[in-house]
Swiss-Prot record:
Mg(2+) binds at residues 496, 498, 500. Its cofactor is Mg(2+); Zn(2+). Binds 1 Mg(2+) ion per subunit. The lineage of its organism: Eukaryota, Viridiplantae, Streptophyta, Embryophyta, Tracheophyta. This is DNA-directed RNA polymerase subunit beta'. The gene is rpoC1. PANTHER family: DNA-DIRECTED RNA POLYMERASE, DNA-DIRECTED RNA POLYMERASE SUBUNIT BETA.
Length: 691
């Protein structure tokens, strides 16, 4: 619709859409078409839609059949009919009305254009934050707005000869007669000549400044200024330092914008429109409802508003030679506001409303949001080989795996299962294979497992706001009717397990499967594409689980003063400490020789997850060389003694040799330590195998 749309379509293989600025020549190429008789059509000149009496599109109007194609396939405006695609038919268009004999579906993608009487800035580039026009020109946004909406003008002598304003500025004294002569130029027939020579205002002034920019020189100057600011030391003045910091941030954004323009071969002056594209009629329809009433898209009314004001401005500039200059500038402002409303209604303040006080839906309103063209119409469509279900946590899954319910998996991979059934001579034809699938024979699940083994699936959670909204996983069959998801990938999807739903898609072609494996697998997207920080980090449920796992009740020895873990627990029938597994005459002070015994006791429900316990530990140099003073020392009759510290205990012999070390811990800490240890060992093995 605007000069931001550029569609590149490969009719044989791919379809893709690119959004960016395009040149007026490209807009003209989209809209204009040369008829077989040599006539050029494509410009929409009239603000009318249909003739009231005949219900036929107005010629050169918003629904003109000469510009956009016939309403009915093969039928022109006169009512003549030709067979589409018939090579025997010599005449491809009607000589009387100038309508081509083509398929009516052409009205869905053939565009038109409006030739604007004055340049108009694109409101997305001017008013959206950050303002690209203000950034690249390095001027305040309010100053540019005042210039665009004709609130003021600036002198711009475009020749080396002395002009009226330049000569006036060179003189040291004021000539009173000049003051009275200036307004005369705005009411005479020579106003256009005077304005074009002496002053500049409106979007044309912005376009001239953008056209004069040399992007590479601008990039070099911005880089030099940024380096100079970086070399300056702090002045000690907080306000000045903040000002310099803001300037550096602005220069970085400006350089990124200039690099984008250079990389994509976009000229900055294209941000100012001279031609306004007109959407195909099928995308802004007029529908007749019961009772003969017509329902029209709001876009049509906004287009009519633009054409009315543009035609008025054209008449003022061409036919009325004695038009006051102030009236011309006022009309240019109205054209600018009409285009702003068409592109983004309400961006400048109060939105435009119809007779029923309803806000008009502009182009931005149509494409943005949850109910916009992209998210609802394009991304929200139901497609083949896809399913949808609620997500739940899958703690036993690997990072690259997802749990797929049997009911969904058999439907998604049914063609592949049928192919393997016939290939293995387990079914004679497709009908027999489908019958086996409906009966859910055991062989079906075995074949399904083999099919899924090397076939990734794509999981998507709406809204898809960035690249990590769609990721690839290796499917694993699970029971139930919900999709199981590893909790570490939730942040990329912005998902949680409170009822969120996700869609699953099966990539069919080899290219799609290769793309999923090489670029989209979850274990290959561990960093945020925006800022580079880790995105696969524990969140929500995992943080709560880690908190519960590592919570403790009176873990320190000083807290319970040995009442829950009497040191004499170590004195058992045998003095062989290495064979003692579970020796606890008290309720809360068990001693364990290894972590397996502690976890086994927890599984037998003999101890709790957060209950303190003593775990025999290997001789740790950090413990041996610790300078911590023992809280108490217990001596035994056999000569051994026990040094009791805050979180560990040392058993020494008569010769002060360390026999055993016991750590004060919980089952939760033991489990977390074992998981971390196994992960590090697995990483070390993978690293050694690669090297």
């Amino acid at each position: 619709m605007n000069n931001n749309f550029s569609s590149m379509i490969d009719r044989y293989k791919h379809q893709q859409l690119q959004i960016g600025s395009v040149s007026p020549q490209q807009i003209s190429a989209w809209a204009t078409k040369i008829l077989p008789n040599g006539e050029i059509v494509g410009e929409v000149k009239k603000p009318y839609t249909f003739l009231y009496k005949t219900n036929k599109p107005e010629k050169e109007g918003l629904f003109c059949e000469r510009i956009f194609g016939p309403i009915k396939s093969g039928i022109c405006a006169c009512g003549n009919y030709r067979v589409i695609g018939d090579e025997k038919e010599e005449q491809k268009f009607c000589e009387q009305c100038g309508v081509e004999f083509v398929d009516s579906r052409i009205r869905r993608y053939r565009m038109g254009c409006i030739k604007l009487a004055c340049p108009v800035t694109h409101v997305w580039y001017l008013k959206r934050l950050p303002s690209y026009i203000a950034n690249i020109l390095d001027k305040p946004l309010k100053e540019l707005e005042g210039l665009v909406y004709c609130d003021f003008s600036f002198a711009r002598p475009i020749t080396n000869k002395p002009t009226f304003l330049r000569l006036r500025g060179l003189l040291k004294y004021e000539i009173q007669s000049w003051k009275s002569s200036i307004p005369l130029f705005f009411t005479t027939q020579g106003f256009d000549t005077f304005r074009n020579r002496e002053i500049s205002t409106g979007a044309g002034a912005i376009r001239e400044q953008l056209a004069d920019l040399d992007l590479r020189i601008l990039l070099e100057n911005s880089l030099l200024e940024w380096k100079d600011l970086g070399e300056e030391e702090n002045t000690g003045n907080e306000w000045e330092d903040r000002k310099a910091g803001r300037r550096k941030g602005f220069l970085v954004r400006r350089m990124e914008l200039v690099k984008h323009f250079i990389r994509t071969n976009i000229e900055p002056k294209w941000m100012v429109l001279c031609l306004l594209p007109v959407l195909p009629p099928e995308l802004r329809p007029i529908i007749q409802i019961d009772g003969g009433k017509l329902m029209s898209s709001d876009i049509n009314e906004l287009y009519r508003r633009v054409i009315y004001r543009n035609n008025t401005l054209t008449d003022l500039l061409t036919t009325s030679r004695s038009t006051p200059g102030e009236l011309v500038m006022c009309q240019e402002k109205l054209v600018q506001e009409a285009v702003d409303t068409l592109l983004d209604n309400g961006i400048r303040g109060q939105p435009m409303r119809d007779g029923h006080n309803k806000v008009y839906k502009s182009f931005s309103d149509i494409i943005e949001g949850k109910e916009g063209r992209f998210r609802e119409t394009l991304l929200g469509k139901r497609v083949d080989y896809s399913g949808r279900s609620v997500i739940v946590v899958g703690p036993s899954l690997s990072l690259h795996q997802c749990g797929l319910p049997r009911e969904i998996a058999i439907e998604l991979f049914q063609p592949f299962v049928i192919r393997d059934l016939i290939k293995q001579h387990l079914a004679s034809n497709i009908g027999v294979a489908k019958s086996k699938i409906r009966e859910k024979e055991p062989i079906i699940w075995e074949i399904l497992q083999d099919v899924m083994q090397g076939h990734p699936v794509l999981l998507n959670r709406a809204p898809t706001l960035h690249r990590l909204g769609i990721q690839a996983f290796q499917p694993v069959l699970v029971e139930g009717r919900v999709i199981c998801l590893h909790p570490l990938v939730c942040k990329g999807f912005n998902a949680d397990f409170d009822g969120d739903q996700m869609a699953v898609h099966v990539p069919l072609s080899l290219e799609a499967q290769a793309e999923a494996r090489l670029l989209m697998f979850s274990h290959m997207n561990l960093l945020s594409p925006a800022i580079g920080d880790p995105i696969s980090v524990p969140t929500q449920d995992m943080l709560i689980g880690l908190y519960v796992l590592t919570s403790e009740k009176h873990r320190g020895i000083c807290t319970n003063r040995y009442t829950n873990c009497n040191i004499r627990t170590l004195q058992t029938k045998s003095s062989d400490y290495s064979n003692s597994k579970y020796k606890n005459p008290y309720n809360n002070g068990p001693f364990f020789c290894n972590s397996y015994d502690a976890i086994g006791a927890y599984r037998q429900k003999r101890i709790n997850l957060e209950s303190p316990l003593w775990l025999r530990w290997r001789l740790d140099r950090r413990v041996i060389t610790s300078r911590e003073t023992p809280i108490e020392v217990h001596y035994e009759s056999r000569g051994t003694y026990f040094e009791i510290y805050g979180h560990f205990l040392i058993v020494r012999s008569l010769k002060k040799k360390i026999l055993f070390i016991y750590l004060r811990t919980t089952v939760g800490h033991i489990s977390l330590y074992r998981e971390i240890e196994e992960a590090i060992q697995g990483f070390s093995r993978a690293w050694s195998s690669d090297t």
